[in-house]
Amino acid sequence: MVPSREFFEEEMDRVLENEAQKLSLTNLLKNVFAQTLDMKPEGVLTTEEALLAWLVDECKKEYLHQLIELVMQVPVSVEAPTTSAINNSLGIIRQTHGQGEDNFGRLLCSLSFASCFLELVLQSDERCLSVFASELAKFYVESQNLWLAYSGGLSAGLRERFPRSWLYFALKQKWLRFIYFFK
């Protein structure tokens, strides 16, 4: 029996939606990491990006010692140091999400670890940042999609859990876009 045309169209729509989610999350993560690593993000950050970058910075400040210890324990291969470093650190993030119920706390811890890792091991290299953000987005879209959907998506989840901070960054980012527009 040959699958129907509708089946192929539905499958293609699902694949395209999945790829669009990955691309969107990759861009968001690149901008968040660029902001936390004092690199220039692409344009003015969105409210989600600005709030997430601030939360990651606060998490890094509070747990810097523990994060540095974790980063220094990541094994790195001599033959392909960048590739092995990225794969091993992503393995740690997968293990973090594999234990217990997922929540925004785990997301913030993972992003804080990733930010420290990018800064200390990969030395804030822009190409490594892009590869790392892409692989991390792929992990979240493929493995954590149910949790993200259940929490209403990243934007709605952040707005619900951090309402005052969300409002502050929404106003701040609108003001920055206004200023940026007139430059």
UniProtKB/Swiss-Prot annotation:
Q: Return the InterPro entries for the record.
A: Bcl-2-like_sf, Bcl-2_BH1-3, Bcl2-like, HHV-4_BALF1
One record GO biological process: regulation of apoptotic process
Which residue positions does the secretion signal occupy?
Answer: none
Q: Which chain regions cross the lipid bilayer?
A: none
Protein family: Belongs to the Bcl-2 family.
The name this protein carries in UniProt is: Uncharacterized gene E4 protein
Identify the species of origin: Equine herpesvirus 2 (strain 86/87) (EHV-2)
Which taxonomic lineage is given here? Viruses, Duplodnaviria, Heunggongvirae, Peploviricota, Herviviricetes
Q: Which gene encodes it?
A: E4
